[in-house]
Amino acid sequence: MGAGLPAIAAALIHPARRVLAVCGDGGFMMSSQEMETAVRLKLNLVVLVVEDNAYGMIRWKQQADGFTDWGLTFGNPDFVAYAASYGARGSRVTGADGLAPALEAAFNAGGVQLVVVPIDYSENIRVLSGELSKLTAGPGRKAWD
């Protein structure tokens, strides 16, 4: 967690390429201050924040192992305003059909762009812990055992 935004290095090394950092909201907040660095260096970087107001992937793993959900939810700042506070530009996607156009607009705009998209990991729990486990691990075993 927290390793997505350091994609700044890719933007430094390959300034002509499209660089996309994909971060969960919890992981993003662990290194979000690096947006200042990206803005100061005038990088072209798109940061996609998938927002569920929780450590969603940790929740999925804990639920898959039968643990009670505890201490995994949190409140987020207004990410669009947060991006603006660093001199970046932010936008919010409200549905899946808006994601591709929002990313394309962010890449075309240049500079540091933050795109926030809500996500519901509950489908992951059903598919990854149930259906995929049965297909990949065999009867009675979890895929990560």
Please report, for each region that a protein language model flagged, where it lies by residue.
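Thiamine diphosphate
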Residues: 1-145
